A protein has these predicted regions:
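Structural alpha/beta surface segment adjacent to cysteine/selenocysteine redox centers
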Residues: 56-65, 71-77
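N-terminal leader/targeting and pre-domain segments
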Residues: 1-15, 91-106
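Short alpha-helical
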Residues: 27-28, 52-55, 87
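Thiol-based oxidoreductase modules, predominantly thioredoxin-like and allied folds used
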Residues: 1, 21-22, 37-56, 62-64
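Non-catalytic, surface beta->alpha helical segment in thiol-disulfide oxidoreductase systems
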Residues: 69-105
Length: 106
């Protein structure tokens, strides 16, 4: 299954989707895999090599690796470019896992 199909399949569920945009040459590449491994049971994760999958990167307006996009269905909830610490990602995931977009805050 290709990257686009993986993203579309993940967007059909109610689960959070974390897109991890990377480049093999990036000096940050080495710490991305442990991060992905830690969170793969909590959210759907799709890794996107920005050089190989330029069309997907362009869709999300990604220019720099690493970049991260957290979304549910078609709604982008959070974005980050650059170094990402596990605690930071953990907090963001927990916040949005408990967030219900259908609750009105009047």
């Amino acid at each position: 299954m290709g990257i686009t199909e993986q993203i579309e399949e993940a967007k059909r569920s109610d689960s959070l989707l974390l897109l991890v945009f990377y480049a093999d040459w990036s000096p940050h590449y080495e710490w991305i895999e442990p991060l992905v491994h830690e969170f793969k049971k909590r959210v759907n994760i799709v890794r996107v090599n920005i050089e190989v999958n330029r069309k997907v990167a362009d869709t999300y307006e990604i220019e720099i690796a690493p970049s991260f996009v957290l979304q549910r269905k078609d709604k982008v909830l959070w974005e980050k470019t650059g170094k990402l610490f596990p605690g930071e990602l953990r907090d963001v995931i927990e916040m949005f896992k408990s967030w219900d977009p259908y609750i009105r805050m009047d």
